[in-house]
From Swiss-Prot:
Belongs to the IPI1/TEX10 family. This is Testis-expressed protein 10 homolog. It comes from Danio rerio (Zebrafish). Component of the PELP1 complex involved in the nucleolar steps of 28S rRNA maturation and the subsequent nucleoplasmic transit of the pre-60S ribosomal subunit. Residues 14-23 have a biased composition (Basic residues).
């Protein structure tokens, strides 16, 4: 075989037969094995460096995984961070900076599950950290939120609104400070800037045009509703978090009600703190004429303005600039939505649930735009601008079919399918769709009445075509007997207030107030609703009474004022807050001399000041003070009312200071005080005046004193030779309360013109009503011993009957004084009264000494007599009076010494003899000195 043929054999292929396997090559690799992946769910760590998750991952590992390329790893890291921080709350604030920065960076992540987990973690962190701790990191959060809201991806824009919800819920104040940027972002979510040079700006549609995106999971109208709902919430936060300045209407409750209020800044002063004159009081703070100074210092430069916003919304001009961009978009949105609704129904006033929610958000935004201005005068400028710019559009698009109702659409049952996935995306739409027609109609009324200018008759005539339906709607809504919620009622009352003030018509005023009064007269209203109606009528009368005569002459308002005392009697202590609100109106109305109120107040005075169940004793202290102050304006004080007031002062159910104020008020209303007015009507008769003061002086009425005479002896200090009267001991609180009352009674009686006549009246009253009593309360005895010396005239001699009764009272109180060991204040008061009477009333001390008959005393009473005499002798100012009756004193001591004539004497007798010898020697020394000179 040739060499050439051999070479061909080397490259010749082996032909395989069908069904035979190819033989393996000599260098073939055996692949008969299986491989498995190694999965490490947790770190293999032996030493614990800090808190970890159940997978043994610490916070550094979790934060590092947030930068992983795999979405599942990032989502697991976010879940792990929430687990770690919830198990260790102290780590939240410790790692707040890095956690917030990393979470904020994931707002724009391309994976939806990662963004959702980031929002859940942000919500958890926001619940744990207060706003002051987040403030340093909030610019970063706001920047990432802006990136998400302006992102090209529709899904990221939708997730950005959920981030906005979290920040609005937990940090509204911080978020509202970034409104210059975020408001422009809202515009870009639903619109885009028109191209310049196309001529579209001249058509009045604004510089922005609505956009329609087909890539979203919801319709364009649903997306706009979602954005407008967040925009409304954001504007609400901006308005509420803005610091309240002078002249701005109150944002709590009914913002319109405080519009006409003066700009005087009140200064609260507690006079008790300035009794000694050590502190200075600034009575006026510019009287409201100058604005409060605010510091212009900033920790960081202001943020750059966003799209559509060049300056902060702090003036009418800046708000107008933003409104000029936003309002045309809102009108265009509503025209588009309303056009689609008319295709389905011929009734333009019936709206679908989605259109109803859309209109409500549009109207809410319009209302909030007006409240963006910080001062009252700028609000008027903004209202005028809205009227000139958009009144025609509002009447055409909003008022044409007013009022609106809900269109009921039959819903067919659909099979459950994968559409549930769209539920989270349209969550904002669902939240904004639950709007009642009443809320939409009321909000529309609020927006429209702000466009009516006040004080211009020709303007009012021009506005009658759209103000008339509003007035009819309000009247029917308030008068149909349905119970309204506090939110809807507050909005309706705001509209009523505005229409009453602007139209200045007595017919319109009575018509609207009659509707409100019908709502007010309903029974079983909630406390919030009742309080709201009370505040409306009260502020309408107090603030607008003098500025608007048509309000002052309203018959409905007069009828409401006349019903207040009756309501106060019926309400009582069942609701102290509502009673306090009633009194806040009754007092200024009484001060202004409202005849209807004063007549009703006079008619129900005895019920209001009833000592058992009246408002003056069952309400809190502040309300009690108002009731006492109202007495100053009461037309008359009949005897029945004075009896109630006297018992109120004596029962102790009001404080001593308040009882003092009440007594002084009655005193000033009497002609005897010399301070009453020169009018012919006498509010208080002299007889009733003196009867009131005598009853208050005694502390017990005649019926109560009569009942004490039949009281069991176990509750009394029995009468004896040294205590001629049976004493009824009162409690310490009652005694001290009555002591303070006695002081002011004595002061008032002491200021009367003729003291002799006053004392004669009091003397006859004591003799006729008290002298024949056997059982006398201790406070009554002390009151008489305190009052008689102060009222006794030098040239007037008291009667023997009065002196003997005072002697019995003094003896009984001296005996009681020795038994008062625990109460020092009561003992001091008793001794002060006894000393004043013994040292000032002529012959009283002699009668007391004459009643000390040693031979008639038992052995147990002798020490008591000795202690009384020692007490009288030890007092320096009584020594001269005692020595003036030295013969009686010497006779008593001789009888005591004769009774104990033995060598052994009791200690009480030794003390008495010592006091007597000291007093006698001192008196003789003084007499010797006078003889020398």
């Amino acid at each position: 075989m040739s060499k050439k043929r051999k070479r061909q054999d080397d490259f010749q292929k082996t032909k395989l037969k069908v069904g035979k396997k190819k033989p393996k090559a000599d260098n073939a690799t055996n692949v008969n094995f299986r491989s498995k992946s190694i999965h490490l769910p947790e770190q293999l760590k032996h030493g614990e460096s800090g808190p970890t998750t159940h997978r043994h991952l610490d916070i550094k590992d979790l934060l590092s995984q947030l930068h992983h390329f795999n979405s599942n790893v990032k989502q697991g890291a976010l879940v792990g961070l929430r687990e770690l921080l919830s198990a260790n709350p102290t780590m939240v604030e410790l790692h707040a900076s890095v956690v917030l920065s990393e979470v904020a960076a994931l707002f724009t992540d391309k994976d939806g599950s990662v963004r959702a987990a980031a929002v859940r973690l942000l919500r958890f962190v926001a619940q744990c950290i207060p706003s002051e701790r987040v403030a340093p990191f909030f610019p970063l959060l706001s920047a990432h939120l802006t990136c998400a809201m302006t992102h090209i991806s529709e899904a990221i824009q939708e997730e950005a609104l959920r981030v906005l919800d979290v920040l609005l819920e937990h940090y509204p104040g911080l978020l509202s400070q970034r409104h210059t940027v975020l408001l422009g972002n809202f515009l870009e979510l639903i619109s885009q800037r028109r191209k310049s040079g196309t001529g579209q700006d001249k058509s009045g549609k604004g510089s922005y045009a609505l956009t329609v995106t087909t890539n979203r999971s919801v319709t364009a109208q649903q997306w706009r509703l979602t954005v407008l709902l967040r925009l409304s919430n954001f504007l609400q936060a901006v308005v509420e978090e803005r610091p309240l300045e002078e002249g701005v209407s109150s944002r709590i409750g009914l913002g319109m009600w405080a519009v006409e209020k003066g700009l005087v800044t009140p200064v609260d002063v507690t006079w008790e703190e300035h009794v000694n004159g050590q502190g200075k009081i600034q009575l006026f703070e510019n009287s409201g004429a100058g604005p409060t100074s605010h510091s212009a210092y900033r920790l960081r430069p202001d943020s750059k303005s966003g799209a559509g916003m060049d300056k902060e919304l702090c003036s009418a001009e800046t708000v107008q600039g933003f409104a000029a961009t936003l309002v045309p978009l809102l009108l265009e949105i509503w025209v588009e939505a309303a056009g689609g609704g008319r295709v389905q129904t011929d009734s333009g006033h019936l709206l679908s649930a989605e259109s109803m929610a859309l209109m409500f958000q549009i109207l809410s935004i319009l209302q909030l735009l007006r409240r963006m201005t910080p001062q009252r005068d700028q609000q008027d400028v903004l209202d005028a601008w809205f009227r000139n710019s958009y009144l025609t559009d509002f009447k055409q698009h909003f008022m044409k079919n007013f009022p609106y109702g809900l269109l009921e659409v039959a819903r067919h049952k659909k099979k459950a399918d994968g559409k549930r996935i769209k539920q989270p995306v349209a969550a904002g739409v669902v939240a904004g769709s639950t709007v009642e027609p009443l809320a939409v109609n009321v909000t529309l009324c609020q927006v429209m009445v702000t466009l009516s200018l006040r004080g211009q008759d020709h303007v009012a005539a021009e506005d009658a075509d759209w103000l008339g339906p509003i007035r009819v709607f309000i009247r029917e809504t308030l008068s149909n007997g349905s119970k309204l919620s506090s939110k809807h009622l507050a909005a309706l009352l705001e509209v009523v207030w505005r229409m009453i003030v602007t139209q200045r018509s007595r017919v319109v005023t009575d018509e609207l107030l009659q509707a409100v009064y019908v709502q007010y007269q309903q029974r079983n209203l909630s406390v919030n609703v009742r309080s709201l109606l009370l505040r409306f009528f009260s502020q309408l009368y107090i603030q607008e009474h003098q500025n608007h005569p048509h309000i002052a002459r309203s018959r409905i308002l007069a009828r409401w004022l006349a019903s207040l005392p009756v309501q106060l009697v019926q309400l009582g202590s069942r609701n102290p807050q509502l009673s306090a609100q009633l009194l806040e109106t009754v007092q200024p109305a009484a001060a202004r001399g409202n005849k209807d109120l004063l007549q009703s107040l006079q008619k129900n005075a005895c019920s209001l000041y009833d000592p058992q169940e009246g408002c003056v004793v069952v309400l809190p202290v502040e309300s009690q003070k108002r009731l006492v102050q109202i007495l100053h304006f009461l037309p008359e004080f009949p005897a029945e009312l004075l009896a109630c007031l006297s018992e109120v002062c004596n029962t102790g159910r009001v404080s001593a200071s308040l009882a003092t104020t009440l007594i002084r008020t009655v005193h000033l209303r009497s002609p005897l005080s010399g301070c009453s007015s020169a009018s012919q009507d006498v509010p208080l008769k002299d007889v009733d005046y003196l009867s009131f003061f005598f009853t208050t002086l005694t502390g017990f009425s005649s019926d109560m004193l009569r009942a004490l005479q039949d009281k069991d002896e176990d509750d009394l200090l029995a009468a004896s030779t040294l205590s001629p009267l049976s004493v009824y001991t009162t409690s310490l609180d009652q005694f001290l309360h009555h002591w303070d009352v006695v002081e002011v009674v004595c002061h008032c009686l002491d200021t009367l013109g003729s003291r002799a006549q006053c004392f004669d009246v009091i003397q006859n009253a004591i003799i006729n009503n008290l002298a024949g009593l056997v059982v006398v309360p201790d406070c009554v005895c002390v009151a008489l011993l305190r009052c008689v010396p102060r009222l006794l005239d030098v040239n007037f001699l008291p009667s023997d009957t009065l002196l003997h009764f005072l002697s019995d009272c003094c003896l009984s109180m001296l005996s009681l004084l020795l038994q008062l060991e625990q109460s020092a204040r009561k003992r001091d008061a008793v001794w002060e009264a006894c000393f004043a009477a013994l040292s000032s009333v002529p012959r009283l001390l002699r009668l007391v000494l004459q009643s000390f008959r040693v031979l008639d005393l038992c052995e147990d009473e002798l020490p008591v007599l000795a202690q009384i005499l020692s007490l009288l002798l030890q007092h320096t100012q009584l020594r001269n009076h005692m020595m003036a009756n030295a013969s009686f004193l010497q006779h008593i001591i001789q009888d005591l010494t004769h009774y104990y004539g033995g060598e052994s004497r009791e200690q009480w007798l030794i003390d008495l003899l010592y006091c007597y010898s000291v007093t006698l020697s001192t008196h003789r020394a003084n007499m010797g000195i006078r003889d020398i000179y």
